[in-house]
Amino acid sequence: MGDKRQRARVQGAWATPTKSQSAARPATPARSRPSQTPGPSWRSKEQQQCDRRFVFKEPQLVVRAAPEPRVIDREGVYEISLSPTGVSRVCLYPGFVDLKEADWILERLCQDVPWKQRMGIREDITYPQPRLTAWYGELPYTYSRVTMEPNPHWLPVLWTLKSRIEENTGHTFNSLLCNFYRDEKDSVDWHSDDEPSLGSCPVIASLSFGATRTFEMRKKPPPEENGDYTYVERVKIPLDHGTLLIMEGATQADWQHRVPKEYHSRERRVNLTFRTVYPDPRGAPGDTSAELPLR
């Protein structure tokens, strides 16, 4: 009897549940089961990923501005640059010749100097230079493929001016290039007085008479600029009646200068540029200039 009950219990364990048992524990459909909700820390990570935005930005270009020109209009000695070539220096002396004497000298120069309009050569093209010139010196002088023949016949007024400049500056000169700017249309283009016959670091004394014209300078660009003068240093110097300007040191090696055309009417102007020419450039001395005040 006991064995029958035990077998019935074992068989009942594998039997299909009764209706009452099925109703007591209804099966839960899979779709109605609650889903797992992420915790606060994981939700914040998802939010950070959703907030990320990748915005493309155009590459920014480096803007280079050309420097403002430096204006020199007062008496003094100015070091305008320092390079491996040396110090570039200009000395400005307004009123070196007083107005009354300067008026008389201007008249003498306009009348007595043998002015001539010479032909220049640029890129194998010949053109009339936009100014009149004259040369004084024992030796010829060649610049911009134009040769000035020797002319030892100095006018007394020119010799007197040369001696006065030498006495007051301590420099000596043996030659003179004269330029006559007839009006605002006459000019001289960018150049350096760096001909081999002038030696290294030549000293140029420029004495002006007549209408005021602006003397402009620009520094020669470094090799990496490939000859582009856009961003170089610049200097402007107004040269008045009777003003003396000295350029010395490495100025001709490191800088260019010009007298540009003017947009407004200008009267006549004569510029005398004293210099030293050597028969053999190999024997020319180097830079011996110093900051010599006007005596």
From Swiss-Prot:
Which residue range or ranges hold the Fe2OG dioxygenase domain?
172-278
Q: What class of enzyme is it?
A: oxidoreductase
List ligand-binding residues for Fe cation: H191, D193, H257
Q: The organism sits in which domain of life?
A: Eukaryota
The record's annotation in Pfam families points to: 2OG-FeII_Oxy_2
The catalytic activity, as recorded, is: an N(1)-methyladenosine in mRNA + 2-oxoglutarate + O2 = an adenosine in mRNA + formaldehyde + succinate + CO2; a methylated nucleobase within DNA + 2-oxoglutarate + O2 = a nucleobase within DNA + formaldehyde + succinate + CO2; an N(1)-methyl-2'-deoxyadenosine in single-stranded DNA + 2-oxoglutarate + O2 = a 2'-deoxyadenosine in single-stranded DNA + formaldehyde + succinate + CO2 + H(+); an N(3)-methyl-2'-deoxycytidine in single-stranded DNA + 2-oxoglutarate + O2 = a 2'-deoxycytidine in single-stranded DNA + formaldehyde + succinate + CO2 + H(+)
Please give the residue ranges the record annotates as the region Disordered. 1-48
Q: Which GO terms describe its biological process?
A: cell population proliferation; DNA alkylation repair; DNA repair; negative regulation of cytoplasmic translation
- Kindly list the GO CC terms recorded for this protein: cytosol; mitochondrion; nucleoplasm
Describe the PTM: Ubiquitinated; undergoes 'Lys-48'-linked polyubiquitination. OTUD4 promotes USP7 and USP9X-dependent deubiquitination of 'Lys-48'-polyubiquitinated ALKBH3 promoting the repair of alkylated DNA lesions.
Residue ranges annotated as compositionally biased, kind Low complexity, are 22-35
Q: Which InterPro entries match?
A: AlkB-like, AlkB-like_sf, ALKBH3, Oxoglu/Fe-dep_dioxygenase_dom
Signal peptide segment:
none
Q: Provide the positions where the record notes the PTM (4R)-5-hydroxyleucine.
A: L177
Cofactor(s) the protein needs: Fe(2+)
Question: How is this protein's activity controlled?
Answer: Activated by ascorbate.
- Entry annotated with the keyword DNA damage: yes
Biological function: Dioxygenase that mediates demethylation of DNA and RNA containing 1-methyladenosine (m1A). Repairs alkylated DNA containing 1-methyladenosine (m1A) and 3-methylcytosine (m3C) by oxidative demethylation. Has a strong preference for single-stranded DNA. Able to process alkylated m3C within double-stranded regions via its interaction with ASCC3, which promotes DNA unwinding to generate single-stranded substrate needed for ALKBH3. Can repair exocyclic 3,N4-ethenocytosine adducs in single-stranded DNA. Also acts on RNA.
The record's family statement is:
Belongs to the alkB family.
Protein name, please?
Alpha-ketoglutarate-dependent dioxygenase alkB homolog 3
| Naturally occurring in which organism (per UniProt) | Rattus norvegicus
